[in-house]
Amino acid sequence: MSSGDRPVVLPANQPKQFYRGGASIAALRGDESADFGPEDWVASTTTLYGRDDAGLSTLPDGTLLRDAVAADPTAWLGERHVAEFGADTALLVKLLDAGQRLPVHCHPSNEFASTHLNCRHGKTESWIVVGTSGDEPTVYIGFREDVSPELLEGWVAAQDNDDMLAALNPVRVAAGDTVFVPAGLPHAIGEGVFIVELQQPTDFSVTLEWKGFLANADIGHLGLGYDAALGCVDHNGWAKTLDTLIRRTAGDTAEVVPLFSEQADPFFQADRLQVSGSLTLEASFAVLVVLEGEGKLGDVPLRKGSTVVVPHGAGEEVLNGELVAIRCRPPRLAG
């Protein structure tokens, strides 16, 4: 079984999805001939909703990462993390390439998940835009104005897709932008947007706009029925406060660029590392996604498209080379 004392390069891990995409993931990984899907779950200890194994990452020796962490959580995650979360990475990282617009949907909060789904984690997420295609790459975030429960129920019952999408705030995005998506916030990612996504480690989604995307409505409400599932939706208007969710970081040339504001700290952390020479990284469980260039993490070779899981037990590591990478980490611990 893989030990938690050195970084491990991971292959692609692509559980089947209902929507199109994947060309940008294939291009990043340098394997454009492969039949890539729209999502690549990196260092995943999370399964697809309702599935036993689909979605789990496998280490090079054939061990599931989930099992390796469970066997030695302190080595993989660190003593302080284990004291708070046990043998739970508390993080899921994805590469997501939207080859079509995704449906309007949202995710439950910790409180809703605990009450209705018997799970500690809901699904707050953040998007790091790393590439776009097309003339108007757009994401849709939160209702423009307050929407009553009755109006939303009517849209969902009638599958009034046009009105649901029109009710959201459209935001043009470019590489370097980040978007924080709190649990409950209705949203959709537009065609041509390629992101590194950090999220809580669940696959809980309430699909408001299921027609044309899912086989039937039953798949969209987490087995709760829409009457209960819609209780997780944020009905508030966000037009006046949308800027609190968005950061534009493309022009920041610092060696380490924090990508999220403090509101993300209880859920995850991410930095863009822009290395020309060497950079020392403190000990932490982390997921590294290399966007450009090449180099080494310790003695582990890296190139564009490399995805790496770094155990806390690897200790302080030096990143050498000429490269740009996203470093993803679990929630910031208090104290």
Regions found by a protein language model. Give the residues of each.
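Short acidic-glycine-tyrosine-enriched beta hairpin
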Residues: 168-180, 297-316
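Loop-centered beta-sheet repeat module
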Residues: 156-207
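C-terminal amphipathic alpha-helical segment
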Residues: 206-278, 282
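His/acidic/aromatic-lined binding-pocket segments of jelly-roll/cupin-type domains
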Residues: 93, 102, 119, 125-128, ...
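Ligand-binding loop in jelly-roll beta-barrel domains
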Residues: 97-101, 132-135, 185-204, 301-303, ...
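Short, basic/aromatic beta-hairpin or loop at an interaction surface
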Residues: 148-161, 281-289
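Transition-metal
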Residues: 1-147, 211-240, 270
